Amino acid sequence: MSGFYHKHFLKLLDFTPAELNSLLQLAAKLKADKKSGKEEAKLTGKNIALIFEKDSTRTRCSFEVAAYDQGARVTYLGPSGSQIGHKESIKDTARVLGRMYDGIQYRGYGQEIVETLAEYASVPVWNGLTNEFHPTQLLADLLTMQEHLPGKAFNEMTLVYAGDARNNMGNSMLEAAALTGLDLRLVAPQACWPEAALVTECRALAQQNGGNITLTEDVAKGVEGADFIYTDVWVSMGEAKEKWAERIALLREYQVNSKMMQLTGNPEVKFLHCLPAFHDDQTTLGKKMAEEFGLHGGMEVTDEVFESAASIVFDQAENRMHTIKAVMVATLSK
């Protein structure tokens, strides 16, 4: 794909609005072709390395299925399956894998790791998630939003993110809003706002593209008129137990529930979540939360909202594969 060949995909602000839009158009075409049985393999003979320092369901499956659909082969390197950063430096790992593979996906820790891989690998490197950014998720989110509001431009859409906005999702949403002109509202306690420098940079770009970025602690004001309400988990199994109580106390009033959905005043408002979601007590962590903190109806989102007709989370999950496929095709085929 012209302009993308041999490029890295590390964060959204590395691209222009036009480039982002062309990736979304390619993803929509690849999705339609797959469903109609007309998909053409553009990556036959390509070899792809998937480095996972953090386990994943959606990201791994999306990369593997997308690669297989396009005729490529993959090697999965899990948390215990490589020497990266332990016995071998990131720089050396990049130079080794770059000699053997046509593309490398990295999902793990600091953004500096994926940036170093990109600097030394000599092949396209894709960010499957770092502590700072999650760009492939936002591609899927944007495609899903387009599908559910056909005919509307992004700068005519309002996206609310409720909860902990200081993480990789909050940062990537800021970058997405900057490029698309979304009306993005981060509804969160001030302690959970992203870094001010990134907010300032992205707000200026968003305004140039017809959008706006708002940070507020006021739930009612923040969600008014929203087309989409998005949230993510508040805690993870890797965090100290002491953090759980602190985080839940801080974010409890930002839970996505039927009241919040109604406060939008939009009967067609949709619910988004990057998954996994703790919406019931059917998981190990969900059960712990229910028992220790009384969160029997869900944590960051209630089961009622998650299972409602407003929920489009599984459309999002499917679109991870189509958008990741677009990234690989665009960067590996001429």
Swiss-Prot record:
A Pfam match: OTCace_N
Effect caused by changing residue 87 to Q: Much less active than the wild-type
Binding site for L-ornithine: 168, 232, 236-237
Biochemical pathway: Amino-acid biosynthesis; L-arginine biosynthesis; L-arginine from L-ornithine and carbamoyl phosphate: step 1/3
Keywords attached to this entry: Allosteric enzyme, Amino-acid biosynthesis, Arginine biosynthesis, Cytoplasm, Metal-binding, Transferase, Zinc
Its EC number(s): 2.1.3.3
Listed PROSITE patterns: CARBAMOYLTRANSFERASE (PS00097)
Any Gene Ontology CC annotation: cytoplasm
Binding site for Zn(2+): 274
Main localization category: cytoplasm
Phenotypic consequence of residue 56 to H: Much less active than the wild-type
UniProt effect for mutating residue 274 to A: Zinc ion is no longer a tight-binding inhibitor and does not promote isomerization
Enzyme class: transferase
Subcellular location(s) of the protein: Cytoplasm
GO biological process, one term: arginine biosynthetic process via ornithine
Single GO molecular function: ornithine carbamoyltransferase activity
Role according to the record: Reversibly catalyzes the transfer of the carbamoyl group from carbamoyl phosphate (CP) to the N(epsilon) atom of ornithine (ORN) to produce L-citrulline, which is a substrate for argininosuccinate synthetase, the enzyme involved in the final step in arginine biosynthesis.
UniProt subunit comment: In E.coli strain K12, trimer of identical or non-identical chains are composed of ArgI (I) and/or ArgF (F). The trimer has the following composition: FFI, FFF, FII, III. E.coli strains B and W, which are known to contain only ArgI, produce only a trimer of identical chains (III).
Similarity remark: Belongs to the aspartate/ornithine carbamoyltransferase superfamily. OTCase family.
The protein's name in its UniProt record: Ornithine carbamoyltransferase subunit I
Record organism: Escherichia coli (strain K12)
Lineage, opening ranks: Bacteria, Pseudomonadati, Pseudomonadota, Gammaproteobacteria, Enterobacterales
Gene behind this protein: argI
